[in-house]
C-alpha cells in the first residue's frame, strides 16, 4: 500500500516515482521569502545537512523558546510546510505540529506559546501569498510552478484539520486561479503549433487532473462560500473547459472522470442540476459516457425522489455501451470501478423512495447485476474483481429489500448454462457469501448432479465454489449431513485418477480443519484413499498432532512403503509426519527411528537438488529430537534415551557406508552433511567415539578430499581436522598432486595438506627443517615454506623454459595450496612473528615474479594459440590429453608441449596470484593503517606501503592488458578485495586511491590526450577485456559505504562519451570501451536498481550506436549493450510458449515500461515517425546500401524491444503514453524494404492494437486489396507495376491481425477470404513471396473455421480456385525464390477438410500428395505418421505413447490441421490410411529409394519417420528375422524409433518368440541404454524389455525353472539393472514398473502368491534392486555353484568392463549410477542365494564399509 500511495503522490506532482522517492529524502530548500532572513531559526534550518536534521530543527523551533521574533516562527513554519514536497519527512512533521495535540505538548512560557488562532493565521497568510504569486500576468507563471502550488494547497485537505480550516478562508482566491490555469493548460494541449512531445502532453494532462481534483474538492467543501464569489466567469468557464476535457478522445479516463464530476458539481452549484440529469438521460455518443457516469455518482439519496426514473435511464445507457464495447478494456475498467462506487451509495436510496417507486430501485439493481454478470469472468483482473464485488453489493441490497428475483437470475444462469462455467461459478460463489448454501443447493440441483462430480479437482472456479460452499455449510448443517454431502464427495473425487490430487488434498485438509477429530476417524481407516491425502490432512491440523504416535502405529506399513515409494510428494509428507511434532523435546520412538533409517538408506542417492534440500531440512528436525534424547541419556540412562543413542550409532554407520568410492554426488552431499551434524551433536553432548563404539570413517573421508565438488572437500576436511588426531597423508604423495597438471589433483593435494597441518600427530614428517622461532602454527609454516621452495624451483624453470615448467611444475597447484593454507590462519597473529612477516614478503615477491612470467601469455593477442620457444617443439612426440589421468614425471617428459598446456599454466597461475594478493590485502595488517608509535615499536604489519603500491599497479596492469577471460575475471576478484579494503580504510591515502584509479580509467576510456599513451594499452577487442571488470570492481565495492557517487560519476561520463559522437578512430575506440563498460555495469547484480535511472539513456546510446557506428567494433559493442539492457529490463530469457510467443515473464505492459523510462517514449516516437516518413518518401533515396542496412538494424532492434510490450488494461486510464500512439508509424513501417523489419513491425502492430482497432485495420486492408484486384483485373497483369514490399507488408499485417480477432466478425472474414482468392492468380504472376503470404492468411482463416456454417458452398468454390492454379507454375516460381511450396499443400488440406467429405480428404492426402511433381515427401510422411500415431494412441493397449509423438517433433501446421478435424473425420481418415494399399506402396517405394540412393537428398529425419510409419500400417511387410538382423547393424539414430516400434509390434503379435532372437534383441536393448543415447531411446529400451519379460521370457524367469538359459537371464538382469540406474527419472520409473509388473520382485509374507497376479507397489530402484536380484538369482534352481557364479558374472558384466568403469566412475553422462554399490548388492544377493558360497574376492573399495 505504501508503494501505491507513493505512485499516486508522484503522479499528483507529475514526477517519476523513483525520482519522487529521492525528492522525499532530499533536503527541503528554504522558501524564497526567507533566504536572506537573519533569524536564528532560519539559519539553524539552513545549516542542516540531512532531512533528519531538518526534522529535528523544525521540532526545536516549534517547541523551543525563541528569544526574539517569536511572531515570525509560525509564519516561517507555515511557509516551509507549503514549500515541502508531499510525503516528505519535514512536511509530515510540520503537519503534526500544526495540530491540537502539538499545542497541548508545549512547555514554553505562556507568552511564547503558539496558539491555534496564531497558527491558523500563519497558514492562511502563507496560502494567500501562494495564491498571489500565481496572479502575476506578465510574464505568466510556468505550468510547473502553478501545478506545485495547487498540489501543495490541495494537500491541506488530506488529514490536516488546520490546513482545511485555513484553506476554507482563502477559497475565494484559488477558484479563479484554477479556472485560469485550466484554460491555459487546455489551450496548450489543443495548440497544434506547439508540437508537444508525447511526454510533455502527458504532463499537461496530469496538471489538468490536479487542477480539476482541487476544484472538485473546493466545490464539495465550500460551495456556499463560492456562491458569494461575484466573478460569474468561474462556473461558466470551468464548465466549458470540463466539457471539452471530458469529451476529448485523447484525454486519459481518470482525467475525464474528474472533469465529468466537476460538471456535475457545477450543475448543482449553478442550480441547473435537474436539467443536467435530464440531458444525461438522453441518448448520447460514446464520448459522453464519463459525463453520464458522473451524473449517477453525484446523485444524493434525497435526489432519487425526483430523479429515480432518470437515473435508471442513464444506467441503461451505460450498460448498453458496455455491451456494445465489450472488447474495449480501459472502458470496462472505468465502468466497473465507478459502477461499484455507485452501488455502495444505493443503501440509503431505498429509504427515500416512495412506495410507488420501489420498482425503480429493483430495476436499478437489475441493471447493475446485468453488468456484473457480463464481466465477472473477464480476462482483465481489475474488471473481474470489481464485477465480483459489484455483484456481491447488489445481492446484499436485494436481500435487504427482499428482492428474491435477483437471486433467481443467478440460479437460472447456473442451471441453464447461459454463461461460461467460470462466470456461473463465480456468480454463485458471491451469492453463497450473501445468502448461504441451502437455497443454492435447492435451486441448483446440477451442483451435485453434474458440476461437482465432473469438474471438482479439474477447474479452479469449481474448486473455489466448492470450498466456499463447504465452509458456509459447516456453520448451518448437522455434522452427519455435512459429512455425507461434502466430505463424501471429496473422498469420491480423490479416487478418480484424472483429478488433480494436490487440489483435492488441500480441500480435504480444509475440511479436516473444520472437524478434526470426527473426520480423522473417517479418513484414516479408509484403505482406498492414497496415503498422501491422509498425511496432508493430519499435518495440516494441529489438533491431531498429539495423536500422531498412535496414528503412526496404525499406518506403519503404509508410511514405510511411502518412504521408499516413487511419488516425491508422498515421500516428503511421510518424512514430515515422522519428524515434525508440536513438542520438539519429544523423543523419537522405535518406529520413527526405523522409518528414518529406511528413508536415509534409500533416498540418499536422490539426484534432485530440490528434494535433497527438503529432505535434509526435515532430517535436521529429527536430529534436534535426537539431541534431546542424548541430553536425557547423559542425565539418566532411560531405555528410551538408550534407543536414541543406538539409533545415532546406526545412523552414523549408515552414513559412513554411504561414502564408498563411486558414490554419486547426491549421496555424498547428504551423507557428509548428516555425518557432520551427527558428530557435532555427540560432541556437543559430550559423548566420545569410544562411548559410541564406532570409529571415524577416515579412509572414506580421505577419499572425499578427491571429490570433484569443492564444498564436499571442505566438509570432509573439516571432519578430519576435528575428529582425527593422526594424519596418514604422506608429503611425497601430496607434492605429486600439487605438481600435477590437473587442477582437480592440485585441489585435492591442498586439502590433504590442510588436514596434515591440523593434525596433532603425523605419520610422515615434512622434508623441511623445523623453525623453532615460530610460535603460531609451526606445522603450517613448514608446509608453506616447503611449497615456497618448490615454487622457487618452478619459477626458475619457467623463466628458462615456460613450456617445460607447464609440464613438470605448472606452479598453480603450489600457489593454490599456499592460498588455501593462508585462508585457515589469522593473519593478525602472524604479523607478530618475524618469520611469518618474512614469509609473506617472500610470497608477495614470488607472486609478482610469477605474474611477470605468465603475463606475455595471457596478454597475447591470441592466448589460446600462444606457444613460446620450448625444447620439444621440433620433436615428433605424439599429442596426448594430459588431463585424462595423472601422469608421472617420466611420462610427462615424453609428452609434447601444446599451447593449451601453456595457457592452462599461465591463466591458472595468474588466477592464484591475484587471489593470494587480493586476500592478503583484504585480511592482513597494513603498514599505512598502523599508528606511528606502533610502527616504531613493533612494526606488526604484513604488507608495506611499497608492496601495496606494487600490488595495486599489478592489478591495474592485468586488468588493462590481459586478454584471456579466465585470467582477468580472477584478477577482478582479487582487485575487488583490494578495493573493498581501500574504500573502508582509515588511512586517507589508501581511501583516496580507488577514486584516483576511477579518474585515470575514465580518462583513458574517454581518450583524453594526456592519457593517450596509457589508453593504447587497453584491449580494443574481446569486449574491452578486463577494463569493464576494473570499473565494476571500483564502483561495486563503494556501495558498502552507502554512497553511490562513483557510480553516478562513471555512468554520466560514459554516457557522455557515447552521446558526444566524437569522430575519428580515437572516438570510435572510446565509444566501444564505454559501451562495453556500461554493459558490465548494467549486468552487475550488485548495482541492482541503482542503474535503473541510467537505463533509458543506455538504450538510446545502444540504438544510436547501431545506426551511427562507422566500424563493426562499435556496432558489436552497441549490440551487446542492448542485449544486456533487454535482459535487465525484461528478465532472463525463459522458454517460449508452444506457439512461439515470448514467456509472459519476459514481457511487460507499456504502462509500466514507460512509467519507468518515460523519456524512451519520445525517443521511440520520434524514431518511428522518422522511419515511417522515409518509407512514405521512398526509402531515403540518396543513402547507400550500408546506411540502409544500419538503419534497418536499428529499426529491428527497436522493434525487438517493442515486441516485448503489450497494452495494459489501464491503457489510457491515467496517462496518454499509450502504445496505440506508435501504431500509425508501425503500419507504414510494414512497407519496409527489409523482410525482417516487415515481419517484426506486423507482429508489434498486432500486439499494440485492440480488437476494435484490429477490425478497422482489417477492413482498410481488405478494401485496398480489393481495389488492387480490380486494377489488376482491368489491366494486363504483366504491365502493372506493383510495390511488392508494400503488398507483402499488408499481407503480413493482415495475418497477425486475423490471429488477434479470429472469426469474431464472420462477414468481414468471409469478405477477406473472397478478396484474397480473387487476388491470388494475378499475384502469383508478380511475386511468389507475396503469393505465399496471401495463402498463409487464407490458411490462418481456414484453420479457425472449425464451427459449421462459417463457410458456405459458394465461398468454398471461390477459395478452391486458388488450388486449381497450375501446380507446376506454383512450384517453379517458389523454387526461383527459394521458397518451400509446403504452404500451398497445407492450404489444400484445409480446403478439402472444409468441404466436409471424408473420402475426399483421404483421396487428397493419399493421391494428391503422392504426385511426383511436388516432391513433398517430408510433408506427406509427416502427415501420415502423425495421423497414424494418433490413431494408434486412441486404441486400447496402444503401441505408442505421448513420448513417441513428442520424439518426432511434428510441425505446428500438421498438429493444427489434425486438431481441426472432427472426431469422425479423424477416425475415418486414420482407418483409411491404416488400410490403404497406396500408402503402403508409397512408403515401401520411398524406403527402397532411400536404401538405394547414393546422393544425400534424403534427410535423416525423413528416413526415421518412414521407418516408424511402416510399422503403423496394417500390412507393414516386416519380418522379425529382418528386424533382428537390423538390430546388429550400424544405422542412424533417427531410425531407432521405427525399429523399436516394429520390434514391439511383432513381439506383441507373435505368440512365441524363437530362442535365437532373444539374445540379439537383449544385446540391442543394452546398446540403446548406453548413457550417451537419447533419453527417448533408453525409455524405448525399457518398453522393449517389458514386452520381452511379459510375453516371451516369462518361462525363464519364474521360480523353479530347471532348463535355464544362463546367458539369457544374465543379460536380461544386467539390462534391467542398467535401466534401474539410468540418469533419467522417467526411465528408472519405467524400469520399476517393468520389474513390479512382470512379477520379478520377491516379497516375503503371506502376500507373496498374491503379488504374482497383481501389480506390486512401485518403490524406488534402490529398494527394488535387492528383491529383484533375489528373484533372478535365488529362485532359480542350480545344482552347481559355478552356474550361480557364472550368472552373477554375466549380470555384472555391464558394470565391470573397462568402458563401464570409465563411464560410470567419472559420472559425466550418468550422475545416478553407483557402480561399486551395484556390484556390492549383486555379491550380497549371491550370498543370500547360496550361503555355502565362500566370500568372493571383490576389487579394492567395493566393500570397504560392508
Curated annotation (Swiss-Prot):
Domain of life: Eukaryota
InterPro entries named in the record: ARM-type_fold, THADA-like_TPR, THADA-like_TPR_C, THADA/TRM732_DUF2428, tRNA_methyltransferase_THADA
Main location: endoplasmic reticulum
Tissue specificity note: Detected in the larval fat body, salivary glands and wing imaginal disks (at protein level).
Oligomeric and partner information: Interacts with SERCA.
Role of this protein: Together with methyltransferase Trm7-32, methylates the 2'-O-ribose of nucleotides at position 32 of the anticodon loop of substrate tRNAs. Plays a key role in energy homeostasis by regulating the balance between energy storage and heat production. Functions by negatively regulating Ca(2+) signaling pathways that are involved in heat production and maintaining correct lipid storage in the fat body. Regulates Ca(2+) signaling pathways by reducing the activity of the calcium-transporting ATPase SERCA possibly by promoting uncoupling of SERCA ATP hydrolysis from calcium pumping.
Name this protein carries in UniProt: tRNA (32-2'-O)-methyltransferase regulator THADA
Species name: Drosophila melanogaster (Fruit fly)
Lineage: Eukaryota, Metazoa, Ecdysozoa, Arthropoda, Hexapoda
Gene giving rise to this polypeptide: THADA
Amino acid at each position: 500500500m505504501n508503494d501505491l500511495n507513493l505512485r499516486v503522490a508522484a503522479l499528483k506532482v507529475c514526477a517519476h516515482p523513483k525520482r519522487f522517492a529521492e525528492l522525499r529524502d532530499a533536503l527541503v530548500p528554504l522558501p524564497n521569502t526567507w533566504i536572506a532572513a537573519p533569524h536564528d531559526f532560519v539559519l539553524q534550518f539552513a545549516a542542516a545537512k540531512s532531512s533528519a536534521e531538518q526534522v529535528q530543527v523544525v521540532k526545536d523551533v516549534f517547541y523551543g523558546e525563541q528569544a526574539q521574533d517569536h511572531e515570525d516562527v509560525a509564519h516561517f513554519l507555515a511557509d516551509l510546510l507549503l514549500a515541502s514536497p508531499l510525503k516528505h519527512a519535514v512536511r509530515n512533521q510540520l503537519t503534526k505540529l500544526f495540530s491540537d495535540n502539538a499545542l497541548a505538548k508545549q512547555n514554553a512560557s505562556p507568552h511564547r506559546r503558539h496558539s491555534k488562532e496564531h497558527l491558523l493565521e500563519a497558514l492562511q497568510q502563507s496560502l494567500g501569498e501562494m495564491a498571489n504569486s500565481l496572479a502575476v500576468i506578465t510574464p505568466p507563471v510556468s505550468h510547473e510552478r502553478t501545478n506545485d502550488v495547487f498540489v501543495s494547497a490541495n494537500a491541506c485537505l488530506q488529514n490536516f484539520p488546520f490546513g482545511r480550516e485555513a484553506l476554507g478562508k482563502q477559497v475565494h482566491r484559488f477558484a479563479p486561479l484554477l479556472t485560469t490555469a485550466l484554460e491555459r493548460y487546455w489551450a496548450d494541449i489543443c495548440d497544434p503549433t506547439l508540437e508537444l512531445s508525447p511526454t510533455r502532453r502527458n504532463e499537461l494532462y496530469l496538471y489538468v487532473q490536479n487542477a480539476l481534483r482541487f476544484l472538485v474538492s473546493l466545490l464539495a467543501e465550500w460551495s456556499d462560500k463560492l456562491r458569494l464569489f461575484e466573478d460569474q466567469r468561474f462556473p461558466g468557464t470551468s464548465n466549458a473547459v470540463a466539457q471539452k476535457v471530458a469529451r476529448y478522445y485523447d484525454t486519459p479516463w481518470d482525467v475525464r472522470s474528474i472533469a465529468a464530476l466537476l460538471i456535475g458539481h457545477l450543475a448543482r452549484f449553478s442550480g441547473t442540476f435537474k436539467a443536467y440529469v435530464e440531458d444525461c438521460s438522453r441518448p448520447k455518443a460514446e464520448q459522453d459516457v464519463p459525463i453520464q457516469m458522473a451524473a449517477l455518482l453525484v446523485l444524493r439519496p434525497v435526489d432519487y425522489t425526483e430523479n429515480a426514473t432518470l437515473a435508471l435511464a442513464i444506467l441503461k445507457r451505460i450498460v448498453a455501451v458496455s455491451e456494445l464495447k465489450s472488447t474495449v478494456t480501459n472502458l470496462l475498467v472505468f465502468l466497473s470501478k465507478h459502477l461499484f462506487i455507485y452501488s455502495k451509495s444505493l443503501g440509503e436510496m431505498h429509504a427515500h423512495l416512495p412506495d410507488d417507486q420501489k420498482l425503480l430501485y429493483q430495476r436499478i439493481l437489475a441493471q447493475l447485476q446485468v453488468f456484473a454478470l457480463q464481466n465477472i469472468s473477464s480476462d482483465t483482473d481489475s474488471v473481474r474483481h470489481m464485477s465480483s464485488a459489484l455483484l456481491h453489493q447488489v445481492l446484499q441490497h436485494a436481500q435487504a429489500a427482499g428482492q428474491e428475483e435477483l437471486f433467481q437470475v443467478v440460479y437460472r444462469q447456473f442451471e441453464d448454462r447461459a454463461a461460461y462455467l467460470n462466470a456461473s461459478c463465480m456468480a454463485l460463489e458471491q451469492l453463497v457469501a450473501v445468502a448461504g448454501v441451502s437455497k443454492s443447493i435447492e435451486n441448483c440441483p446440477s451442483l451435485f448432479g453434474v458440476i461437482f462430480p465432473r469438474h471438482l479437482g479439474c477447474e479452479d472456479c469449481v474448486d473455489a465454489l466448492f470450498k466456499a460452499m463447504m465452509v458456509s455449510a459447516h456453520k448451518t448443517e448437522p455434522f452427519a449431513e455435512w459429512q455425507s454431502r461434502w466430505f463424501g464427495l471429496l473422498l469420491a473425487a480423490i479416487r478418480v485418477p484424472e483429478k488433480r490430487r494436490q487440489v483435492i488434498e488441500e480441500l480435504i485438509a480444509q475440511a479436516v480443519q473444520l472437524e478434526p477429530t470426527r473426520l480423522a476417524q473417517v479418513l484414516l481407516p479408509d484403505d482406498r484413499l492414497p496415503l498422501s491425502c491422509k498425511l496432508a490432512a493430519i499435518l495440516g491440523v494441529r489438533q491431531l498432532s498429539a495423536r500422531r504416535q498412535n496414528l503412526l502405529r496404525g499406518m506403519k506399513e503404509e508410511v514405510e512403503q511411502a518412504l521408499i515409494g516413487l511419488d516425491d510428494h508422498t515421500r516428503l509428507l511421510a518424512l514430515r509426519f515422522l519428524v515434525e511434532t508440536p513438542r520438539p523435546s519429544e523423543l523419537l520412538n522405535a518406529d520413527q527411528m526405523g522409518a528414518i533409517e529406511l528413508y536415509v538408506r534409500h533416498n540418499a542417492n536422490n539426484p534432485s537438488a530440490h528434494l535433497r534440500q527438503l529432505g535434509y531440512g526435515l532430517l535436521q528436525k529429527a536430529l534436534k529430537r535426537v539431541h534431546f534424547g542424548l541430553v536425557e541419556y547423559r542425565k539418566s540412562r532411560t531405555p528410551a534415551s538408550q534407543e536414541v543413542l543406538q539409533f545415532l550409532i546406526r545412523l552414523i554407520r549408515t552414513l559412513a557406508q554411504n561414502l564408498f568410492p563411486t558414490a554419486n554426488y547426491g549421496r555424498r552431499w547428504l551423507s557428509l552433511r548428516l555425518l557432520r551434524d551427527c558428530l557435532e551433536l555427540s560432541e556437543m553432548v559430550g559423548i566420545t567415539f569410544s562411548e559410541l563404539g564406532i570409529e571415524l570413517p577416515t579412509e572414506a573421508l580421505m577419499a572425499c578430499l578427491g571429490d570433484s565438488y569443492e564444498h564436499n572437500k571442505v566438509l570432509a576436511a573439516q571432519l578430519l581436522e576435528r575428529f582425527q588426531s593422526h594424519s596418514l597423508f604422506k608429503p611425497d604423495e601430496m607434492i605429486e598432486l600439487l605438481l600435477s597438471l590437473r587442477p582437480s589433483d592440485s585441489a585435492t593435494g591442498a586439502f590433504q595438506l590442510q588436514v596434515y597441518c591440523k593434525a596433532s600427530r603425523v605419520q610422515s614428517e615434512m622434508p623441511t627443517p623445523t623453525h623453532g622461532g615460530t610460535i603460531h602454527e609451526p606445522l603450517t609454516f613448514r608446509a608453506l615454506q616447503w611449497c615456497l621452495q618448490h615454487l622457487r624451483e618452478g619459477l626458475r624453470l619457467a623463466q628458462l623454459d615456460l613450456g617445460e615448467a607447464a609440464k613438470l611444475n605448472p606452479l598453480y597447484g603450489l600457489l593454490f595450496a599456499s592460498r588455501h593454507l593462508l585462508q585457515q590462519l589469522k593473519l593478525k597473529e602472524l604479523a607478530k612473528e618475524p618469520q611469518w612477516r618474512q614469509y609473506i614478503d617472500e610470497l608477495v615477491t614470488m607472486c609478482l615474479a610469477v605474474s611477470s612470467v605468465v603475463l606475455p601469455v595471457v596478454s597475447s593477442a591470441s592466448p589460446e594459440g600462444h606457444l613460446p620457444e620450448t625444447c620439444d617443439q621440433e620433436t615428433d612426440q605424439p599429442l596426448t590429453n594430459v588431463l585424462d589421468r595423472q601422469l608421472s614425471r617420466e611420462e610427462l617428459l615424453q609428452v609434447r608441449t601444446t599451447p593449451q598446456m601453456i595457457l592452462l599454466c599461465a591463466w591458472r597461475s595468474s588466477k592464484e596470484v591475484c587471489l593470494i594478493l587480493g586476500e592478503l590485502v583484504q585480511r592482513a595488517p597494513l603498514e599505512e593503517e598502523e599508528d606511528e608509535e606502533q610502527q616504531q615499536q613493533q612494526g606488526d604489519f604484513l604488507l608495506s606501503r611499497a608492496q601495496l603500491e606494487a600490488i595495486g599497479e599489478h592489478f591495474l596492469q592485468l586488468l588493462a592488458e590481459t586478454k584471456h577471460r579466465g585470467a582477468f575475471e580472477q584478477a577482478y576478484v582479487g582487485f575487488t578485495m583490494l578495493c573493498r579494503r581501500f574504500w573502508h580504510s582509515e588511512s586517507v591515502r589508501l581511501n583516496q586511491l580507488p577514486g584516483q584509479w576511477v579518474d585515470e580509467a575514465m580518462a583513458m576510456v574517454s581518450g583524453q590526450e594526456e592519457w593517450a599513451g596509457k589508453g593504447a594499452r587497453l584491449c580494443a577487442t574481446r569486449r574491452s577485456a578486463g577494463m569493464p571488470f576494473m570499473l565494476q570492481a571500483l564502483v561495486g565495492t563503494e556501495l558498502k559505504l552507502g554512497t553511490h557517487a562513483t557510480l553516478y560519476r562513471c555512468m554520466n561520463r560514459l554516457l557522455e562519451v557515447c552521446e558526444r559522437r566524437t569522430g575519428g578512430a580515437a572516438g570510435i575506440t572510446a565509444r566501444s570501451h564505454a559501451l562495453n563498460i556500461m554493459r558490465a555495469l548494467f549486468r552487475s547484480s550488485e548495482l541492482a536498481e541503482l542503474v535503473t535511472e541510467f537505463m533509458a539513456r543506455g538504450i538510446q546510446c545502444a540504438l544510436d550506436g547501431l545506426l551511427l557506428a562507422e566500424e563493426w567494433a562499435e556496432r558489436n559493442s552497441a549490440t551487446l549493450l542492448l542485449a544486456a539492457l533487454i535482459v535487465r529490463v525484461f528478465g532472463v530469457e525463459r522458454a517460449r510458449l508452444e506457439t512461439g510467443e515470448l514467456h509472459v515473464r519476459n514481457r511487460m505492459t507499456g504502462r509500466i515500461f514507460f512509467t519507468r523510462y518515460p523519456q524512451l517514449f519520445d525517443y521511440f516516437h520520434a524514431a518511428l515517425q522518422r522511419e515511417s516518413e522515409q518509407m512514405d518518401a521512398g526509402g531515403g533515396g540518396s543513402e547507400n546500401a550500408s546506411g540502409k542496412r544500419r538503419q534497418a538494424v536499428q529499426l529491428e532492434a527497436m522493434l525487438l524491444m517493442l515486441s516485448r510490450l503489450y497494452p495494459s488494461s489501464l491503457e489510457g486510464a491515467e496517462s496518454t503514453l499509450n502504445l496505440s500512439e506508435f501504431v500509425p508509424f508501425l503500419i507504414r513501417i510494414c512497407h519496409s524494404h527489409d523482410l525482417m523489419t516487415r515481419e517484426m513491425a506486423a507482429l508489434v502492430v498486432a500486439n499494440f492494437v485492440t480488437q476494435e482497432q484490429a477490425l478497422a485495420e482489417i477492413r482498410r486492408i481488405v478494401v485496398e486489396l480489393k481495389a488492387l484486384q480490380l486494377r489488376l483485373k482491368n489491366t494486363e497483369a504483366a504491365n502493372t507495376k506493383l510495390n511488392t514490399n508494400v503488398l507483402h507488408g499488408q499481407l503480413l499485417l493482415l495475418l497477425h491481425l486475423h490471429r488477434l480477432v479470429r472469426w469474431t466478425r464472420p462477414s468481414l472474414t468471409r469478405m477477406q477470404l473472397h478478396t484474397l482468392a480473387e487476388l491470388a492468380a494475378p499475384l502469383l504472376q508478380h511475386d511468389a513471396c507475396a503469393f505465399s503470404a496471401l495463402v498463409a492468411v487464407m490458411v490462418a482463416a481456414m484453420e479457425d473455421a472449425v464451427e459449421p456454417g462459417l463457410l458456405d458452398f459458394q465461398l468454398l468454390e471461390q477459395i478452391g480456385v486458388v488450388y486449381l492454379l497450375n501446380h507446376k507454375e506454383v512450384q517453379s516460381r517458389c523454387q526461383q525464390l527459394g521458397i518451400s511450396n509446403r504452404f500451398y499443400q497445407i492450404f489444400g488440406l484445409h480446403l478439402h477438410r472444409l468441404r466436409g467429405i471424408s473420402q475426399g480428404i483421404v483421396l487428397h492426402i493419399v493421391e494428391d500428395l503422392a504426385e511426383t511433381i511436388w516432391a513433398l515427401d517430408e510433408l506427406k510422411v509427416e502427415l501420415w505418421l502423425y495421423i497414424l500415431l494418433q490413431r494408434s494412441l486412441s486404441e486400447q493397449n496402444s503401441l505408442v505413447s505421448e513420448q513417441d509423438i513428442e520424439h518426432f517433433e511434428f510441425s505446428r501446421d500438421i498438429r493444427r490441421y489434425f486438431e481441426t478435424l472432427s472426431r469422425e473425420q479423424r477416425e475415418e481418415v486414420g482407418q483409411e490410411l491404416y488400410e490403404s494399399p497406396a500408402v503402403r506402396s508409397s512408403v515401401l517405394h520411398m524406403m527402397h529409394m532411400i536404401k538405394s540412393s547414393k546422393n544425400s537428398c534424403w534427410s535423416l529425419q525423413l528416413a526415421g519417420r518412414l521407418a516408424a510409419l511402416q510399422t503403423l500400417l496394417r500390412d507393414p511387410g516386416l519380418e522379425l528375422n529382418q528386424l533382428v538382423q537390423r538390430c546388429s547393424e550400424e544405422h542412424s539414430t533417427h531410425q531407432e524409433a521405427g525399429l523399436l516400434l516394429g520390434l514391439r509390434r511383432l513381439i506383441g503379435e507373435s505368440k512365441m518368440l524363437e530362442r535365437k532372437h532373444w539374445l540379439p534383441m537383449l544385446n540391442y536393448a543394452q546398446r540403446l541404454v548406453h548413457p550417451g543415447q537419447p533419453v527417448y531411446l533408453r525409455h524405448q529400451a525399457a518398453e522393449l524389455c517389458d514386452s520381452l519379460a511379459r510375453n516371451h521370457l516369462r518361462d525363464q524367469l519364474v521360480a523353479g525353472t530347471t532348463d535355464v538359459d544362463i546367458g539369457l537371464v544374465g543379460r536380461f538382469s544386467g539390462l534391467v539393472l542398467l535401466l534401474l540406474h539410468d540418469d533419467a527419472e522417467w526411465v528408472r520409473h519405467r524400469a520399476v514398473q517393468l520389474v513390479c509388473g512382470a512379477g520379478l520382485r520377491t516379497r516375503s509374507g503371506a502376500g507373496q502368491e498374491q503379488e504374482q497376479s497383481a501389480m506390486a507397489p512401485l518403490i524406488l530402484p534402490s529398494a527394488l534392486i535387492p528383491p529383484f536380484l533375489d528373484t533372478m538369482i535365488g529362485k532359480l534352481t542350480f545344482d552347481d555353484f559355478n552356474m550361480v557364479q557364472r550368472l552373477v558374472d554375466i549380470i555384472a558384466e555391464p558394470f565391470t568392463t573397462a568402458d563401464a568403469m570409465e563411464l560410470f566412475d567419472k559420472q559425466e553422462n550418468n550422475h545416478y549410477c553407483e557402480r561399486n554399490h551395484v556390484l556390492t548388492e549383486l555379491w550380497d544377493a549371491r550370498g543370500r542365494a547360496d550361503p555355502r558360497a565362500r566370500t568372493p574376492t571383490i576389487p579394492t573399495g567395493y566393500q570397504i564399509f560392508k
